[in-house]
């Protein structure tokens, strides 16, 4: 799980060159409209049918802030620098895969736009980079295509494009033995059409290692090919769906491991294990090496972890890579301060507690480059998400200092706070408070339930599982603050600033869409704080004030309800809770949002990375 920079942006990872010639045929589904043909054939084309006007594109780009991350890598050894180059190459591959996972026409659109030399074409290409695909977020927080392609369905491109939730549920009900495969974290669902089945079999023949690592897969596909049918659904692991890309990434990760092994054998071990994971789709070996390893100057989040993009089932992970340079002194100081995790777990408002590993690997880093799902200003990450891996090995927390402490980003947060709050509270927010709230948000993912009372994973809640998990983590960061103040971890002023940061987190500049887990859970907290009189709204000024004395109890009570919903695993109860607390009042919320929008110079952020040079994409 992760947190993103800036309290106003959409957690949809679309917030925020030409296509890969080796891209698997299985995901090279071309949907060419007349508009795309114009784009592809006319580098200096005028506006094509179906694409946004220059004014529409400019409205977004005028509100887009470019953040350039340029950490010093001078301290790296020669081998580490070679490893960086190899990992950046893997990141570019993952970027292609991620974009193709999210939209079936993405790479075709990107290739066409990259060839445009006219000003409007370049603007559309920047929009593509901002959104990591051809679907944009408007200033009114609506989503839609800005070129002539179909809108993306909830399942994006990891399910059949025309598959509905009703059809999938019906199929699983009729074929319960297929449930695990059809809901698997790292697999693509397909229709059993003969041409598709033949392509999958051809890839298994091309890469015998995949056949060996996935026993029974070839026999299942061969069986389906003897009686193909569009109405039959089947799933293939990511390593087969993106075979060319994963085999190439496997080789590059091993080359990176070779380069770094003389100076950091533990990081090399992680890279080798993760390379193998990309072909097996079982991340345990890599995650174990990642969590238990003590790396020197580099770290990297590599693979498919987060499920935010899957709006159909909420179970499928999307690819990302985050390459990080370690801030060693800060990391060492932070680790020494984080003690007593079991006491914090036992203090949560539930009768069910688990045994936690006290020594959580936590590090402070500078982002070298992000790709795919990790791109767009992630401030921190706590992984892995799978409960059984966290129970066996714990988790690792990655704090991205050059995003969290970026002065331009914090200025945006401070401006939002000033626009929303009464003047008496103007000085209560600090950058350090955001840092510590983010840290303990990530710890919050580690604490609390990771299984329902019946022993099922939290995905039993369905697509709303991510929303509840993110809310739980938010609330844990605020709930444990009182105990951390008692221990001397926070001063009284720091505690107040942390609470202010928790309020900032809830504020919205537009009404969230129901499918936005981050924004919806923030709105729900805002409404809860209003209901419990932690927040008061002045209709005359459209400003908010805070009663800090009510804060802890309000957080405790909401956390208790969220944990209870997770433990129950009741999809309908969760949806009802979200509907109840996710309401929007145009005068109250709309008034505050209008104040925020009025002072916001920027609404979107486009991240660029010095390490990528001129080849930003």
Where are these regions (language model features)?
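Active-site recognition of the HExxH zinc-binding catalytic motif
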Residues: 437-450, 473, 478
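Long, well-structured alpha-helical subdomains associated
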Residues: 478-574
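Contiguous, non-catalytic segments that form substrate-binding/exosite surfaces or channel walls
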Residues: 238-426, 430
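Bacterial N-terminal signal peptides
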Residues: 28-40
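An active-site-proximal "capping" alpha-helix that borders the catalytic cofactor pocket
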Residues: 264, 466-483
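Extended, compositionally biased alpha-helical segments that mediate assembly or anchoring
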Residues: 355, 563-617
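Post-HEXXH active-site segment of zinc metalloproteases
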Residues: 449-471
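N-terminal helix-rich structural modules
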Residues: 48-270
């Amino acid at each position: 799980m992760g947190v993103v920079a800036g309290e106003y942006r959409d957690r949809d990872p679309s917030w925020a060159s030409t296509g890969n010639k080796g891209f698997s045929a299985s995901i090279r589904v071309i949907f060419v409209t007349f508009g795309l043909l114009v784009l592809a054939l006319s580098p200096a084309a005028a506006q094509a049918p179906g694409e946004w006007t220059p004014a529409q594109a400019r409205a977004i780009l005028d509100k887009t802030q470019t953040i350039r991350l340029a950490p010093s890598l001078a301290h790296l050894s020669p081998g580490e620098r070679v490893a960086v180059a190899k990992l950046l190459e893997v990141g570019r591959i993952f970027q292609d895969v991620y974009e193709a996972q999210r939209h079936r026409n993405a790479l075709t659109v990107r290739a066409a736009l990259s060839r445009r030399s006219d000003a409007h074409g370049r603007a559309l290409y920047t929009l593509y980079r901002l959104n990591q695909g051809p679907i944009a977020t408007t200033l009114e927080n609506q989503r839609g295509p800005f070129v002539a392609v179909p809108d993306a369905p909830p399942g994006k491109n990891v399910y059949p494009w025309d598959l509905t939730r009703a059809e999938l549920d019906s199929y699983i009900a009729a074929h319960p033995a297929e449930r695990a495969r059809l809901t698997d974290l790292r697999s693509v669902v397909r229709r059993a059409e003969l041409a598709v089945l033949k392509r999958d079999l051809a890839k298994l023949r091309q890469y015998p290692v995949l056949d060996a690592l996935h026993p029974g897969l070839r026999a299942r596909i061969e069986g389906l090919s003897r009686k193909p049918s569009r109405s039959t659904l089947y799933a293939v692991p990511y390593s087969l769906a993106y075979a060319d890309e994963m085999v190439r990434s496997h080789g590059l990760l091993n080359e990176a491991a070779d380069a770094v092994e003389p100076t950091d054998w533990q990081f090399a071990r992680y890279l080798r294990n993760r390379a193998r994971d990309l072909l097996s789709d079982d991340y345990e070996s890599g995650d174990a090496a990642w969590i238990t390893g003590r790396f020197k100057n580099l770290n990297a989040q590599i693979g498919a972890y987060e499920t935010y993009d899957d709006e159909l089932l909420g179970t499928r992970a999307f690819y990302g890579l985050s390459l990080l340079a370690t801030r060693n002194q800060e990391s060492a100081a932070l680790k020494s301060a984080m003690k007593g995790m079991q006491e914090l777990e036992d203090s949560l408002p539930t009768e069910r507690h688990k045994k936690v590993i006290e020594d959580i690997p936590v590090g402070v880093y500078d982002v070298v480059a992000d790709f795919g799902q990790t791109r767009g200003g992630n401030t921190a990450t706590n992984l892995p998400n799978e409960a059984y891996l966290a129970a066996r090995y714990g988790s690792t927390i990655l704090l991205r200092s050059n995003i969290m402490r970026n002065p331009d980003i914090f200025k945006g947060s401070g401006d939002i706070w000033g626009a929303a709050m009464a003047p008496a509270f103007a000085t209560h927010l600090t950058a350090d408070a955001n840092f510590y709230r983010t840290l303990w948000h990530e710890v919050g993912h580690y604490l609390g339930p990771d299984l329902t009372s019946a022993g099922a994973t939290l995905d039993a809640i369905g697509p709303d599982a991510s929303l509840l998990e993110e809310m739980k983590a938010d609330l844990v960061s605020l709930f444990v603050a009182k105990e951390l103040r008692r221990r001397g971890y926070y001063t009284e002023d720091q505690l107040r600033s942390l609470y202010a940061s928790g309020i900032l987190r809830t504020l919205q500049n537009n009404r969230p869409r129901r499918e936005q887990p981050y924004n919806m859970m923030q709105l729900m907290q805002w409404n809860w704080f209003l209901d419990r009189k932690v927040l008061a709204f002045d209709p005359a000024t459209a400003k908010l004030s805070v009663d800090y004395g009510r804060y802890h109890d309000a957080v405790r009570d909401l956390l208790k309800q969220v944990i209870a919903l997770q433990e129950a695993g009741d999809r309908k109860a969760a949806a009802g809770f979200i509907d109840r607390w996710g309401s929007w009042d145009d005068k109250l919320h709309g008034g505050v949002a209008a104040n925020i929008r009025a002072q916001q110079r920027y609404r979107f952020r486009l991240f660029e990375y010095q390490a990528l040079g001129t080849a930003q994409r």
